[in-house]
């Protein structure tokens, strides 16, 4: 039987308004177009490949459908995935998929040849209902505001806001060599980037093109080895020369370039009204599309120095690597303009969600904790992620009240602050 404290906490979680400060929902059509959009979401897709499915079985490009048109009819993609779906029954992604099918659609959690076509019809019919996305986001999730980083589509509907992601300071990545990254910068810029002055003008022109006046935040995916070492203008000139010549760069050179570029970007942003920066760290995507967590000891000191240099900005941070759990908590504890948010990519699993919540409650003032960000591409995937996050929050808070570590009133205040008040204040929501 549920105790009074646990019931009060559960009631607060059931009733709280939720602000989702990072998603990839399409403004014109936030919901899934078909069942394949749901079943082959990239978190599921990569596990199916890892379990034995061919890289090109359900997408001709061998890439997630969020990045490339799969070029294969949805029903055929699903049929090809069926032999591999049983292999992920144990994973959190597999559980999330079952929750979507069962809770939102009333379908069996396990798809097979006998029920596949009916499941496809049900999803198609729901998607044709004008109120479907509103039902999922508002009624089932309680999400009253979202910020999408997707650029395509018409103006955002009510309660959906826009943001942009940009990383003009990452001169190398898991999929691209420095000369390839530099070429992509030059394509955006419209001319060669050969000197630090060229690079500074590239950043300035990029800020102008973004139209940041209409954005709720600028999202920055930082290299974990960002460092003030080798971040002088002359160091940037050396990096640009070596990248142009297709010469290898050291980690220190890449980290210094990143540090210089981020500082330069923030200086340019000071010419605009935008002061909210969303920082994500701890993931690198290797070819063909295999994301891994990554960590470097330089990051914590570098971001603390940047936050100190740019105290007029708000930095809301999330990580895909559990190694940053304590680091981000201590940053938010000690640095006034740094706060923490959600559980991104490789940390969106119950064990790591619990660890993050416990760490943040232990050390971060409650007005600097953001409980949730979906990172979802379709509204249906917001549902299981939020369901899990709320479940773990409920367990953690109930245990703390039972131990006498906090009272029920504090627990309820934490829920309201972390799920709505804090993200609404940080990101300017109503």
Question: Residues of each region from the PLM?
Answer:
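Metal-cofactor-binding active-site regions of metalloenzymes
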Residues: 3-271, 313, 329-430
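Catalytic core of soluble alpha/beta enzymes
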Residues: 227, 235-240, 260-263, 274-328, ...
């Amino acid at each position: 039987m549920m105790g009074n404290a646990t019931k009060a906490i559960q009631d607060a979680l059931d009733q709280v308004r939720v602000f989702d400060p990072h998603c990839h929902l399409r403004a014109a059509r936030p919901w899934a177009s078909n069942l394949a959009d749901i079943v082959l979401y990239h978190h599921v897709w990569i596990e199916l490949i890892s379990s034995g499915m061919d890289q090109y079985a359900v997408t001709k490009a061998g890439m997630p459908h969020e990045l490339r048109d799969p070029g294969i009819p949805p029903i055929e993609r699903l049929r090809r995935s069926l032999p591999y779906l049983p292999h992920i029954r144990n994973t959190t992604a597999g559980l999330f998929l079952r929750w979507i099918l069962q809770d939102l659609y009333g379908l069996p959690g396990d798809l097979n040849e006998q029920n596949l076509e009916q499941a496809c019809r049900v999803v198609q019919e729901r998607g044709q209902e004008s109120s479907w996305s509103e039902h999922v986001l508002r009624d089932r999730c309680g999400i009253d505001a979202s910020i999408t980083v997707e650029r395509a589509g018409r103006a955002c509907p009510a309660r959906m806001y826009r943001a942009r992601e940009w990383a003009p300071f990452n001169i190398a990545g898991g999929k691209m060599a420095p000369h390839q990254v530099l070429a992509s910068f030059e394509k955006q810029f419209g001319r060669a980037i050969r000197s630090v002055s060229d690079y500074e003008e590239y950043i300035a022109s990029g800020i102008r093109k973004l139209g940041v006046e209409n954005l709720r935040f600028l999202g920055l995916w930082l290299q974990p080895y960002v460092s003030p070492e080798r971040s002088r203008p002359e160091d940037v000139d050396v990096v640009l020369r070596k990248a142009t010549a297709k010469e290898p760069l050291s980690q220190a050179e890449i980290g210094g370039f990143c540090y210089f570029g981020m500082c330069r970007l923030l200086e340019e942003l000071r010419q605009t009204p935008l002061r909210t920066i969303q920082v994500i760290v701890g993931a690198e995507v290797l070819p063909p599309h295999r994301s891994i967590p990554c960590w470097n000891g330089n990051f914590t000191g570098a971001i603390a120095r940047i936050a100190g240099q740019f105290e007029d900005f708000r930095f809301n941070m999330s990580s895909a690597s559990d190694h940053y759990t304590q680091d981000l908590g201590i940053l938010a504890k000690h640095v006034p303009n740094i706060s923490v948010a959600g559980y991104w990519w490789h940390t969106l699993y119950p064990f790591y969600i619990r660890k993050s919540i416990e760490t943040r409650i232990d050390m971060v003032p409650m007005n600097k904790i953001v409980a949730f960000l979906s990172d979802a591409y379709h509204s249906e995937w917001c549902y299981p992620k939020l369901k899990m996050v709320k479940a773990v929050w409920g367990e953690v808070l109930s245990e703390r009240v039972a131990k006498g570590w906090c009272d029920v009133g504090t627990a309820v205040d934490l829920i309201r602050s972390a799920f709505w008040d804090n993200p609404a204040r940080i990101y300017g929501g109503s």
